Amino acid sequence: MNLPTLWTWILPPIAGAIIGYFTNDVAIKMLFRPYKAIYIGKRPLPFTPGLIPRNQDRLAVRVSDTIMGSLLTPEELQKLAKRLLDTERVQGAILWLLQLALKQIKGDRQAKTAEILAAILHDLFGESLARLLKVLARRQDFLEKQINQIFDRLVLEFSLSEQQARQFSDWLLETVLPADVIRLALIDFLTDRNIQVIDEGFREKTSGTYWVVANLFGLRNALARLRTFCLDEKDLANTRIKELLLSLEMRNRLKNWLQSISLQNLPISTVRQLRKTTRDTVRIYIQESGEQFLQDFGQTIDWDQIANLIINRLQSSVSMTTSLGVISQELALILERYLEEDLEKLVAQIIPILNIDQVIRDRVNATSPADLENAIQGIVKQELQGIVNLGGILGLLVGLMQTIILIAQNPG
């Protein structure tokens, strides 16, 4: 067997294997090369640029349609949204936001935060709440339950303790009704006319032994002497009045009387009317003066100081820090219940807003042919190497078949 004949048999398998192995790489390069059109004069050469660069716009549309039609369908987007909006993930995100907000309050923005909070509080209590109360006060049942509850628990059940009654009676006898005030009241009361009226009434309405005393002696002289005594002997009169109050145990009597005062002793109809009067008085006052009262009251408050106190309290509050987890969990559960009902509608509304298909087209069109080629070559080398090897094997088999045919045709 001579060398040319041997080469005739060996060359087809080798050539077939080489061609089959490198066909994919050559085919890919032929799809992209050249990247730009080559001109002879003003006429471009045929098949320039490559197939993909020449039809890159149409390729972008096809890629976008394929992805949106097969991969990113509304159902898949819903599943993706459910995975992304898992309760634990949402809770973690909300907790992070709350902690970030708390850190912002603790940081350099405290003054700004306090200023904003002060403005909110001033508007809420000075303006918004005042207008709201004025509108609500027009209703006949405005604060009815609340006022009735306050009346029943505080006013109706109110009674003085023994110590309070003692202090109150001491205050009455020492400040409101001291001996000197009682003496002056007696002087003012015992005018000539009042003395005459008392004496005549005593004479006319008594009978028996008292009638004899009243008509023989009367009360005129006794009352006149009492008035003169109070006028002339001030200190002595005050001393006698104090002794009289002490002898009559007025302090204890007054204390016992104060302790016995209770609205529960009144008739039920009177209590009901008193409750209704209290409720109507409060409602009418709020209707007429409530708005102005709240506005004036709001002007007297240092809202900046209040805001700073609130922020400082939040900063040092352990319960505030520990409650962030509970708050984030509750908010996450609320969001989960909402998404269970309306996730399909939300996804249908979000897809046109995101405009994913146009984003895909823009990205494909913005990618240079060289980058596309490198990306496809990388995929082929990393993920489709088996196809490349298979091409080499098929080329080898085709070459062997050709060698067999040649041997069969030339047996000698």
UniProtKB/Swiss-Prot annotation:
InterPro entries: DUF445, UCP032178. The keyword Lipid metabolism does not apply. It is a multi-pass membrane protein. Its main location: membrane. It is found in: Cell inner membrane. Keywords: Cell inner membrane, Cell membrane, Membrane, Transmembrane, Transmembrane helix. It holds the Pfam family DUF445. The chain crosses the membrane at residues 3-23, 387-407. One of its GO terms (cellular component) is plasma membrane. Belongs to the UPF0754 family. This is UPF0754 membrane protein MAE_37850.
